[in-house]
Regions:
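Chalcogenol-based redox active-site neighborhoods
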Residues: 1-161
Length: 161
């Protein structure tokens, strides 16, 4: 599904990179299957980590599954090379790429404006004014008619993106 969502990741200026404990020959063997099964070609790099150095460094080896089985880990790393999000799924549970796009959008938004995103937020929905910003400053920044004060610590405003 990642390959199918290439344009969505590109819209967010986000690059995808995969890691597998399989070797390059193994990747070359199953990469064509992605096109056949998923209807798109593999369009992002996959790191071969057969010695498991990277997988072990990032705790991607499931302790109960043997040393050849990685858990489904996702890391969102920002342009400053700071890990902003880590998600680890059990081997039996697939990842939710719509959620990953939502998180990338939320991180980019909250990096660019003094806001926070509420639970289940999606782009275009109202956001929470940062608790560190006064209501007066929020009204000046976002517009007096755009800030709704529910409580002194809970103020809503339109998505500024």
């Amino acid at each position: 599904r990642t390959a199918q969502m290439k344009d969505e990741f590109a819209k967010r200026n986000t690059k995808v990179l995969a890691l597998s404990v399989d070797d390059v020959a193994s990747h070359e063997g199953w990469a064509p299957d992605i096109g056949e099964v998923g209807g798109t070609e593999l369009n992002f790099p996959i790191i071969a980590d057969p010695d498991k150095k990277v997988a072990e460094l990032y705790d991607m080896i499931h302790p109960g599954e043997g040393d050849t089985s990685t858990v489904r880990s996702v890391f969102i790393i920002d342009p400053a090379n700071k890990v902003r999000l880590t998600l680890t799924y059990p081997k039996s549970v697939g990842r939710n790429f719509d959620e990953l796009l939502r998180v990338v959008g939320a991180l980019q938004l909250t990096d660019s404006a003094p806001v926070a995103t509420p639970a289940d937020w999606t782009q275009g929905e109202k956001v929470i004014v940062s608790p560190g910003m006064s209501t007066e400053d929020a009204k000046e920044r976002f517009g007096a008619d755009k800030v709704e004060e529910v409580k002194p610590y809970l103020r809503w405003t339109d998505d500024p993106s």
